[in-house]
Amino acid sequence: YNGAIGVDNAGKPVATMGELAKARGMKIGNVSTAEIQDATPAAFAAHALDRSYYAPSGDKKVAKGDQLRENGGLGSISEQIVDLRADVTLGGGSKYFDTEVVQGGKWNASGNTWTAGKSVLDNAKDNGYQVVTNASELEAIAEANSDKPVLGLFSEGNMPRVLNQSIPTTDGGDQQPATCVANPEFTEETPRLGAMTSKALELLQNDNGFLLQVESASPDKADHQADACGLIGEVGQLDEAVQAVQKWVEETGEETLIVATADHPHTAQITYDNANTAGRVTQLTTVDGSTMAVNFATSKTNEDEDALGGQQHTGAQLRVAASGPGAANVTGQIVQTD
């Protein structure tokens, strides 16, 4: 049902892709530029009656009711991510791992022993996780497996976008063309998605195969904020990740199926400059010096910088592209509205 993670309509757990691959003896990896508890990475690893059940305690996105371990549930998404023991887990959302565990003990066959009163992160460390928090620490990791899984947490919330936020207007014709610039919050120690993907591939390679989920999460998040520059930068990160996978396949010669798609459509429109549209418009100067207008037209709430937000998902069909063994069985388009 809508808003749930890894459960059926009755709220009963159904196997996740990560669990299925792990049961077959494959190594598994889960990479996102979002909070690692966000919907796409969570669907790889967890079962939740509500997608917002990130933490076992605290004051934000706390699991409730039957989800809680003290009530016999599977626990928060953060706890379940640790219990899956994916070989590689990389993303944001460290603030939810800093929350306190309420119920100790063992909760599945992972072998983890939980200590109440300690944070989720400290419990992960106690159970053998290698925790990294920046690009240098990630690059230094030499191996990852179920005994020594890697947990990379690179921001308290979603990872910062590559390009600084652009502010739309109600009438693009009144706005001087802007140039997208680097986001100062995205530092040299913030790992790019392509680099995270390459490192995950390096650590996951083994004779039994692997399953790696990689998400460039912030094209969607920039779309919600009518942030044209943020959107462009994060689509660029997706392109880097795809290129990293293709390069790895070419260099290793491994028979590897690559599938690229999205969890739902969320699109902006490129219009002519000085266009008078019903949405929020940002005029940008392109690399060749021309003007490109980007329009966001699913909400009119973006009046100023403080009110950014409110743009909604769109109803387009989704492209599904694939290469490698089995690619012929992957459909070209799917309807995935929400």
What residues fall within each predicted segment?
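Mobile, glycine-rich extracellular loop/lid and propeptide segments
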Residues: 1-51, 59-60, 217, 267
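A post-motif C-terminal structural segment
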Residues: 37-338
